[in-house]
Amino acid sequence: MPRVHAIEDYRNFGIMAHIDAGKTTTTERILYYTGKSHKIGEVHEGAATMDWMEQEQERGITITSAATTAFWNGKRLNIIDTPGHVDFTIEVERSLRVLDGAVCVLDSNQGVEPQTETVWRQGDKYRVPRIVFANKMDKTGADFFKCLQDIIDRLGAKPVAIQLPIGSENNFKGLIDLVRMKAVVWSDESLGAKFEDTEIPEDLLEQAKEYREKMIEAAVELDDDAMAAYLDGTEPEEAVLKRLIRKAVLTGAFYPVLCGSAFKNKGVQPLLDAVVDYLPSPVDVPAIKGIDEDGNEVTRHADDKEPLSLLAFKIMDDPFVGTITFCRIYSGVLQSGTGVVNSTREKKERIGRMLLMHANNREDIKEAYAGDIVALAGLKEARTGDTLCDPQKQVILEKMEFPEPVIEIAIEPKSKADQEKLGVALAKLAAEDPSFRVSTDLESGQTILKGMGELHLDIKVDILRRTYKVDANIGAPQVAFRERITKRAEVDYTHKKQTGGTGQFAAVKFIVEPNEPGGGYVFESKIVGGAVPKEYIPGVEKGIESVLSSGVVAGFPVVDVKVSLIDGKYHDVDSSALAFEIASRAAFREALQKGKSVLLEPIMKVECVTPEDYTGSVIGDLNSRRGQIQGQDMRGNANVINAMVPLMNMFGYVNNLRSMSQGRATFTMQFDHYAEAPANVSAEVQKKFA
């Protein structure tokens, strides 16, 4: 079956925002007006079509990015709903990888919020073209112009209004389209489906002219001919203006800002028009680069004729179909029934069922083309970030990098049956989410879950209980401490064992020194003249690595250490790889003692937004948690406090902050760095773990 929509008519975009800015509601309205859902789902009723996991509907936040296809003005929209809670930044990063553009939704009462900054920075990292939608214009305190100022102050970006609101709060009627110089007004009765163009109200005409002039000045800077004509007194025509705004979006020269109220059904259709007019198609963004089998860089263009390449960006467990892998096809054509190679893992896969997803309904398809986002059922080996490609023309597309988890909990199944279910469930959850890790504590035999924050792990435990029906006891959350040495140490160690027959003999000499923060573990053999034969070096490494997972301070993983093997001795008969492994293990433990190992704790970057009345209490409380206040500023009538606080002092903080501020203060936190723990903390941790 030939391609139905030209690739130029595709818009793969996501909706990114701070929690509660109205992202899911905006997506809902888009699906409603594009005719994909017949009843509008409300988040606060727990019925939104995109939020289809039970946990999301209860908590009213979006956890998984569901991908949905819809149509508008003959263009095909693939919408990826991204979560806006800081514990799920991994999902946002992952969806930004496969988008070509994004709509950044702001709450016009709040302006740019902490999480908006986080997702905006991620957007910058992946160079995602963006337009901005100032939502919730009907809310008390909504201020469109403050949003524009916030984008300059807080995001360091250049906003250009291409619409202005007519009225605000309860009187929000519609908007002025500055490109066409028309007012657009909605009738309340038709759920926002009916709207009409009218003349701009007299009292807003001057303001509209002023902002249209600003918009045109920003646009003509991108085109010499248009600039020359404008300086001669000729304004660009509508088509030229749209072309220039599109160019600005693609190059990041400025960001068009629109306004509306998704909840009140106003402004969504013009937002869809802007998505079509200004966001890129797959051919407008740089072609994706990858590495071929020989390690050379290759490019895959968004073209059906190019060799097949697709990236798995999300894995979900579906109760009806089994494992579903969401993939973005970058080049070529994918047909069900064909064989592909998972080049990341060097495994073959067969393409079975191919589905186009609407939030919770699915449509079977036989073929998919460059630019498509499809869900593949039944892939065996694929993990998030893997490349699938043509077996004859293999390529590995850019790898995704995932942050290290900073918080862990122990989980104990209540019965043998639960134990079995738990194993299966955890394997699936870890495949779906690379920022969630599972390991077994060798000493206690407990299963340890590691994640990005309390909410992240709460939701995983919730999924285990509901979806997989696992009954388990959950331990208190633990901090993922680390250990590192603080000074250079030299050790000489000989392992000798004589018990009749063949003995064991190995001698090693190490220099162990601190590596720079984030440098990880590095091993180097400086052996010359065969003092330690080559075949024993892997044994030496194995010995060191066996100690890395459990240091000498309190048994936590050792990081940022450089080990050089400088000398050694061996015996023709009694030496073996095992003997060198034993010697290296003992030598390295001794070096960690000599090198004055210290405990490192994760430090979180915390931002609290609080009404001024509670500022003193919030700062006092952060100080009592060993927090270091980095600064504060005003945002509207709220005070924003930035602090660095050790994670171990942040457990249960959300409840404390709520009771301290009568529920009015909010906070976000994300991992920032590891720092040496003070002596009293280190002693406390040693007492507990060592």
UniProtKB/Swiss-Prot annotation:
- Keyword annotations from UniProtKB, A to Z: Cytoplasm, Elongation factor, GTP-binding, Nucleotide-binding, Protein biosynthesis
Q: Report the CDD domains cross-referenced here.
A: EF-G (cd01886), EFG_III (cd16262), EFG_mtEFG1_IV (cd01434), EFG_mtEFG_C (cd03713), EFG_mtEFG_II (cd04088)
Q: Where in the cell is it found?
A: Cytoplasm
List, for all copies, the residue spans of the domain called tr-type G: 8-283
Q: Which GO terms describe its molecular function?
A: GTP binding; GTPase activity; guanosine tetraphosphate binding; translation elongation factor activity
Q: Which Pfam families match?
A: EFG_C (PF00679), EFG_III (PF14492), EFG_IV (PF03764), GTP_EFTU (PF00009), GTP_EFTU_D2 (PF03144)
Family matches, as SMART domains: EFG_C, EFG_IV
Identify the main location.
cytoplasm
Family matches, as SUPFAM superfamilies: EF-G C-terminal domain-like, P-loop containing nucleoside triphosphate hydrolases, Ribosomal protein S5 domain 2-like, Translation proteins
Which domain of life, per UniProt? Bacteria
User: Which residues are involved in binding GTP?
Assistant: 17-24, 81-85, 135-138
Per the record, what is one GO cellular component? cytoplasm
Please give the biological process terms from Gene Ontology that the record holds: ribosome disassembly
| Job description of the protein | Catalyzes the GTP-dependent ribosomal translocation step during translation elongation. During this step, the ribosome changes from the pre-translocational (PRE) to the post-translocational (POST) state as the newly formed A-site-bound peptidyl-tRNA and P-site-bound deacylated tRNA move to the P and E sites, respectively. Catalyzes the coordinated movement of the two tRNA molecules, the mRNA and conformational changes in the ribosome.
The entry sums up its family as follows: Belongs to the TRAFAC class translation factor GTPase superfamily. Classic translation factor GTPase family. EF-G/EF-2 subfamily.
Quote the protein name from its UniProt record: Elongation factor G
Native species: Rhodopseudomonas palustris (strain BisA53)
The record's gene field reads fusA
